[in-house]
Structures are given as C-alpha cells and as structure tokens.
Amino acid sequence: MLSQGIAGPRFEKPEEVVEWMGAMQAQDIRAAKWAVGLRIASPSLTAVQEALDTGRILRLHVMRPTWHYIPGRDIKWMTGLSTKGLLSKFRFYAKHFSLTEEDFLRSKPQIEEVLSGQHLTSQEVLEQLHSKGIALDEPIVKMYLSFGEADGTVCSGIEKNGKHTYALTCERIPDAIELSHEEALAELTRRYFRSHGPATLEDFVWWSALNIGEARNAIASLGTEMITERYNDREMLIHASSPGLVGEVEIDERNVFQFLPPFDEYLVSYKNRLDCICLLYTSPSPRDTERS
C-alpha cells in the first residue's frame, strides 16, 4: 500500500500520481477519478478533472485492451509499446462487424478531418460523418476510434457532461516525449515495480501485456535498480526507489479502513490478487487461485 500511494499519500498533483503508477485502469470514469484522488495528499475531484481537461492525464486504451489513465506527455512512447498487441486484439474484435484494419485505414482521413480542432463524443463523430455522407453505425465508429487510439492518432479530449470525448493526439499533446523502444520498456518496468512492488514477473506481464521475454529483458536492463526477494517460494521484485524501502513516507499505524473504488490498481494490477487481499474477504476470480 506504500508503493501504491494508498498509505501515506504524498503526491500534490493528480498527474504525479498517474506518472508514478505508470498507468491506472479507468474503464469506470467516476471510479478512476476516485482512484487518482485518494492517492493525493489533499484529495480534490476538481484537481483531477482539471488534469484530465488540460490533457495532463489522458484516458485511452493502452497495454491491455482496457481504458487506462496515462500521463499526457507519455502518450507517444506508451502507445508505441502497445500498438502491436492492441491492433492484434482489435482486428479480432473487428471481425464481429465484418471489418478489417484496411477498412479503418480507408476511413482514417475522414475521422481525422472530423476531429480536427474539436473534442467530440463517439455519437458526435458519428453525426458529423453522416453529415458528410459517410454512413456508419456507432459500434463501427467506436471500433475505428479504438484503432485510432492503438496507432496513436486519437486520444481523449475534454469531457462533455461526463461523457468521454476524442481528439487528435497531434493537437492535444504536441510536445509528447519520445523514447526508444528499449528506453520505453525500461521506463514502464521502473514505474510498475516502484509503484506496484513487490510483484512477480508474471504480475508485470499481466499488467503490461508485454511478452515474457520482453519483460525479462526490461527487468534485467535495470540492473541494480531492481531488488529481488523470495516470498512463499516465489521471486518477488521491487524497485529501489519504492517508498517502503527508502523510508520517505510517514504513515498512520492505527487500524484504518481504506475504501477503494472498483477496478483500483491495488486489486487489478496483479495476476494473483491473493497477495493483496485475504481469500476470506473476497470471491476470487479463477486466475486468483492459480499460484504463479
């Protein structure tokens, strides 16, 4: 809980939370804002919303084909790590609509034209395409927007009445950070194990959707930054900058309840959740019963 920033929250800004965590699952918009807010020293929904509206935090599909919050300035290298895997999954989903990636590529210029200078909901994208004589159903438009996220063209815009909107990445984040593939792998690995450690290699593979070879190599590339311990006959890893190791956080040692939102990183970012919560207090998913 120290690593996750739940015990002894120390961050001043919402974007600092998301950068520390690497990425935060965010399919439930209200729950995701709560997850960020509870990790801020002075929780503020207004501050979280402002970070989203200004693009300091973005919400999009990255890593696994699930909504995540990521730091806005990191969108280029984070989507770069995810593109291959996401496109593979979206191609599979697209088959249910008799769509191909080539269909998306043909429609991409029209979608970019519609989004240019605007932040639109999927319904508004649909309506503007219809006004141009392009007849598409909303599920197909959403599928095309997902493809656009996967290739880095499209990101989140400013919410409209609590609804997610889309914008062009080049307009929203013109100064996105660029990293080489190896640098990006190392940075994602560093962020995961400092904020989610101790964790296993299998936990990291589950969270990041990297293949196990890439994950192993990324961990090895960090050298002495990584600390290894054994717990219940498993190898556990943690980054040397984790607050539980460097002793930079003061915590209230009294027994306290922590109310976590649905899909909080504390529970969803590990292959084996039994390390996080006692079996007596939960109904585990099938994968929780499989020891790594």
Predicted stretch roles:
Residues 55-60, 152-157, 224-228:
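A short, conserved structural fragment
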Residues 68-69, 162-168, 235-239:
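Minor-groove-contacting beta-hairpin "wing" of winged helix-turn-helix DNA-binding domains
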Residues 225-279:
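Non-catalytic regulatory appendages
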Residues 281-292:
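Single conserved hydrophobic/aromatic residue that forms the stacking wall/gate
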